[in-house]
């Protein structure tokens, strides 16, 4: 097991090989303690071995690593000098650049390949890693040692790791856990880590990027980074940890160390290489930003993240953009590059959640971001790790809701499998389909977008559309643009952190339709995954916008939020504020999608419910229910017409807020445009305009119409029942039996068939067409004719059942006359 000594890093599995033509042992021999310097360079072969003990990072190394991280301001500087001085010092800088600029070290070709070929590594052993330790370490060490036997894909991975190390050092140079950035990519080889750290230090000092952000956890490997804000705990990567520690110490503390001028002189001696590195890094960053919109990697055993986690990610991105210094504009997109390429498994155990929360709190505390740091720390206690996520293929199949600003979200919102709720309130979510009082058939029709059969009037049809819209978000045909409001939620989060309001204050995070009041007395915090999820946002916003124009026109939205958290009447106005988040463009687009007939009905219905807005509501429910009711406190049964009251009463009174919310789709959209013009003075300053809702609404209306237009089942053609078919009452299957029964029935004999010689069993088909038609009816073959029946009669010739009487047409004879034949006098006809 490798351990960190006070003076240098010692590893037992090394053999003193040269790294890229640079003998680290001879450079470090100048230090006072040269014990074990030949062991600084681990073998390249051991890097790709999954059973290497260096790669199995256990809990026993965490104490020594954390203690080394705590010595950052003290004796750790001496450890830094041991490694960084030979890598970046004045004596060996030419040697290092010579090793970089050799012809066989084709970094330009590697970077160009990386810019054109997208590298995706599927994790095999550890689900918490994006790029596994084995892959990256073996490839990076092989590139340094000029190993030509490795494949081109591995070379691309090594360039990926080199560029990511550079970007990581720039992105994470402002916090105490910054040394985890270079260790985040899991290099098991100290040689590969040293080269990556040297390249990162060169790029970082040349650009003089001194930005501070608090995002190193998004770049952490997850395999060994369990020390809360301490030193890097990656396996065998202590050399890179020391280099990163030195670099972070110089950048974070702002104190120039002795080796910083040597970086600059080394760069001045080799300007061409530095220029290549800079241009390629920038090209890769631009290319990755383009590729991020179309790439859907497959990560094993991953679920959709919490919406709060994605909001936290957007908050991190905005913090980075705000804290970029002016001289760091060259690498302004480096942190975004790491955001895009980072994924983590969100199936976290409670122990991992606790560790990551402690780690994030330590990082936010050490970042020193002023007043926002306290809000971040308070917010971390409510949410798990903020992880940038791309829409994974697994999420497309499993149906988790994704709100990512980089992608359109082609996922469906199912209420069956949610990730663990970040609120940790112990209140379980309730499926909206199971909370209503409607019959099962109506629920199924509502899920399919079909109106119930009982909707006779236009108002009843509106209630049916409400139920359909309430349950449509559980289906699989939702339009990709339905899940919006990401930028609005990120701005909302910034305001929340300044006033200390948690994210689930707004209810469901993507819709802006939640009405819970976490600060109220006796009200448990509702989970962020509400049943009134995604389609209710346009409905809720238009309804509240129309009410805003009539009731709270003089209020300012921020002023409302700060004063209305203690009384039940004020909680209703908080619900209105959550509904005000939609812009006028969306309201007008929603208004254009509704028919003129619905608009006339809605204008009549809009006049009564608003007068009761600030008074007691007969159907408003307290907010201590397991799920919130953003609309139940605002709309009475008079909102829906009297004909639909019976259909909607059971739903509203049973606290299914999704149905009540969707009912306002037809009840409030007509007055939305006029109310928007009237409420211009109280326009919310939080929500910006997002993409159009008209496209989404037309999609949903087309979906509902398509579900209604089902083809009718074709009816079976009725058979002509010219005669009664008594022959079907028995179990007759053969034609000769059928003819024998006809001969014994007075209805058919002698009308269609008759005996010519009863003793000999000779009979004649009087009406061959009628007999064949009767036989076809018996066999359920309406196209039966005499030719077809005649072939069956000829078949009986060979069987010895019937015989053809010569010289007479349509005359046949039974070979063996049955004795139990009913005697019918047919000779008189």
Curated annotation (Swiss-Prot):
SUPFAM superfamilies: Winged helix' DNA-binding domain (SSF46785)
Keywords: Developmental protein, DNA-binding, Nucleus, Transcription, Transcription regulation
Compositionally biased tracts (Basic residues): 618-634
Gene3D superfamilies per record: Winged helix-like DNA-binding domain superfamily/Winged helix DNA-binding domain (1.10.10.10)
Gly residues composition bias: residue spans: 224-237, 509-522
One record GO biological process: regulation of transcription by RNA polymerase II
Pfam families, alphabetized: Ets
Signal peptide (from-to): none
Keyword Nucleus: yes
Protein name as annotated: Ecdysone-induced protein 74EF isoform A
């Amino acid at each position: 097991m490798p351990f960190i000594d006070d003076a240098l890093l010692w590893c037992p599995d090394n053999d003193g090989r040269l790294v890229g033509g640079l003998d680290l042992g001879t450079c470090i021999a100048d230090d006072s303690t040269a014990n074990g310097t030949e062991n600084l360079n681990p073998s390249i072969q051991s890097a790709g071995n999954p059973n290497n003990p260096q790669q199995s990072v256990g809990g026993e190394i965490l104490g020594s690593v954390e203690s080394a991280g705590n010595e950052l301001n003290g004796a750790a500087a001496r450890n830094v000098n041991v490694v960084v001085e030979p890598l970046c010092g004045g004596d060996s800088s030419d040697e290092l650049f010579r090793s970089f600029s050799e012809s066989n070290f084709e970094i330009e070709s590697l970077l160009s390949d990386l810019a054109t070929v997208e590298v995706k590594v599927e994790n095999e052993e550890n689900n918490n890693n994006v790029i596994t330790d084995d892959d990256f370490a073996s490839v990076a060490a092989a590139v340094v040692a000029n190993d030509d036997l490795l494949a081109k894909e591995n070379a691309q991975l090594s360039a990926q790791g080199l560029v990511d190390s550079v970007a990581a050092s720039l992105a994470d140079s402002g916090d105490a856990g910054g040394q985890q950035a270079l260790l985040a990519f899991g290099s098991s080889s100290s040689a590969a880590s040293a080269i990556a750290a040297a390249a990162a230090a060169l790029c970082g000092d040349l650009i003089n990027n001194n930005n501070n952000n608090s995002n190193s956890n998004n770049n952490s490997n997850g395999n060994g980074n369990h020390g809360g804000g301490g030193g890097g705990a990656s396996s065998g990567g202590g050399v890179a940890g020391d280099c990163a520690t030195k670099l972070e110490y110089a950048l974070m503390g702002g104190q120039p160390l002795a080796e910083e001028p040597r970086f600059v002189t080394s760069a001045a001696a080799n300007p061409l290489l530095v220029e290549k590195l800079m241009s390629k890094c920038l090209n890769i960053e631009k290319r990755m930003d383009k590729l991020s919109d179309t790439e859907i990697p497959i990560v094993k055993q991953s679920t959709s993240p919490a919406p709060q986690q994605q909001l936290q990610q957007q908050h991190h991105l905005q913090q980075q953009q705000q804290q970029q210094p002016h001289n760091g504009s060259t690498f302004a997109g480096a942190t975004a590059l790491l955001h895009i390429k980072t994924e983590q498994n969100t199936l976290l155990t409670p122990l991992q959640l606790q560790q990551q929360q402690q780690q994030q709190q330590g990082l936010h505390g050490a970042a020193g971001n002023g007043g926002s740091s306290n809000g971040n720390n308070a917010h971390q206690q409510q949410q798990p790790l903020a992880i940038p996520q791309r829409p994974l293929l697994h999420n497309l199949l499993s149906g988790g809701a994704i709100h990512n600003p980089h992608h359109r979200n082609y996922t469906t919102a199912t209420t069956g499998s949610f990730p663990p709720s970040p609120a940790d309130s112990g209140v379980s979510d309730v499926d909206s389909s199971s909370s209503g009082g409607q019959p099962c058939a109506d629920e199924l029709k509502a899920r399919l977008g079909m109106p119930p059969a009982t909707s006779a009037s236009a108002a009843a049809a509106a209630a049916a559309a409400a139920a359909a819209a309430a349950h449509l978000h559980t289906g699989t045909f939702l339009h990709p643009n339905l899940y919006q409001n990401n930028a609005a939620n990120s701005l909302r989060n910034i305001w929340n952190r300044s006033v200390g309001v948690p994210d689930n204050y707004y209810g469901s995070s993507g819709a802006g339709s939640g009405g819970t009041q976490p600060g109220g007395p006796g009200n448990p915090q509702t989970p962020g995954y509400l049943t009134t999820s995604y389609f209710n946002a346009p409905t809720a916003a238009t309804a509240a916008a129309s009410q805003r124009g009539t009731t709270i026109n003089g209020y300012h939205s921020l002023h409302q939020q700060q004063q209305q958290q203690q009384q039940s009447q004020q909680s209703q106005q908080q619900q209105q504020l959550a509904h005000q988040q939609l812009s006028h463009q969306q309201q007008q687009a929603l208004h254009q999608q509704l028919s003129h007939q619905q608009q006339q009905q809605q204008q009549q219905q809009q006049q009564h419910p608003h007068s009761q807005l600030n008074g007691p509501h007969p159907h408003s429910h307290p907010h201590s229910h397991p799920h919130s009711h953003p609309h139940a406190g605002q709309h009475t049964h008079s909102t829906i017409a009297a004909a639909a009251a019976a259909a909607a009463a059971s739903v509203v009174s049973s606290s299914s807020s999704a149905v009540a919310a969707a009912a306002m789709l037809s009840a409030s959209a007509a007055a939305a445009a006029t109310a928007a013009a009237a409420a211009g003075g109280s326009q919310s300053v939080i929500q910006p305009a997002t993409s159009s809702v008209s496209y989404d609404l037309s999609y949903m209306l087309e979906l509902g119409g398509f579900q209604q237009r089902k083809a009718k089942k074709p009816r079976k053609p009725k058979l002509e029942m010219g005669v009664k078919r008594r022959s079907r009452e028995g179990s007759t299957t053969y034609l000769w039996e059928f003819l024998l029964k006809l001969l014994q029935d007075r209805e058919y004999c002698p009308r269609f068939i008759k005996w010519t010689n009863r003793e000999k069993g000779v009979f004649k088909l009087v009406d061959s067409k009628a007999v064949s038609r009767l036989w076809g009816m018996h066999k359920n073959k309406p196209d039966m004719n005499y030719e077809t029946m005649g072939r069956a009669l000829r078949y009986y010739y060979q069987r010895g059942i019937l015989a053809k009487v010569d010289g007479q047409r349509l005359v046949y004879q039974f070979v063996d006359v049955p004795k139990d034949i009913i005697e019918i006098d047919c000779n008189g006809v």
